Amino acid sequence: MNNPFALFDLPIEFQLDQNRLSERYLALQKALHPDNFANSSAQEQRLAMQKSAEVNDALQILKDPILRADCIIALNTGEQQNTEEKSTQDMAFLMQQMQWREQLEEIENTQDIDGLMTFSAEIEQSNKEKISEISTALSMKDWQQAKLINDRLRFIKKLMTEIERIEDKLADF
């Protein structure tokens, strides 16, 4: 795995200076702009394009808290996150997932827009709490806990996407 933190000359930390990230991105994109390679060989142009794609990929990783956490864990442990592998050891969270799914299904079936807004706020709050928890786990180098929290964040992200879908559907009525 390429190290997006190194590419952007940033410390390997979960909390990022967003202004510095933006500044570094603009500087890298400016340096790799196709106009700078107009008189270069085809190979140099291709390499600049590849490097530009790497910069864009790295930016996506650094901007997404889940991908950023996966990256930090991988850089420190050498282990890549297997997103297909589901953790069944976290029974309390599995029960929470089932409860949330049932609640969302009920909201959709009854077309309860107010209920959806309340539910959405609850999930947003849970997301913020998990972001704070993963930040702490990563700073303490508690990789197992960080993986567990990141799995929870992955579920919450999917749930938030589902909430948006239902929001759009109910808005069309």
From Swiss-Prot:
NCBIfam families: hscB
Organism of derivation: Mannheimia succiniciproducens (strain KCTC 0769BP / MBEL55E)
Family the UniProt entry places it in: Belongs to the HscB family.
Keyword Cytoplasm: no
InterPro entries membership: DnaJ_domain, HscB, HscB_C_sf, HscB_oligo_C, J_dom_sf
Ranges of residues in domain J: 3-75
Sorted UniProt keywords: Chaperone
Entry GO CC: iron-sulfur cluster transfer complex
Protein name: Co-chaperone protein HscB homolog
A GO MF label: ATPase activator activity
UniProt record, GO biological process: [2Fe-2S] cluster assembly; protein complex oligomerization; protein folding
Annotated Pfam families: HSCB_C
Source taxon at top rank: Bacteria
Subunit description: Interacts with HscA and stimulates its ATPase activity.
Range of residues in the leader sequence: none
UniProt key word Chaperone: yes
Task of the protein: Co-chaperone involved in the maturation of iron-sulfur cluster-containing proteins. Seems to help targeting proteins to be folded toward HscA.
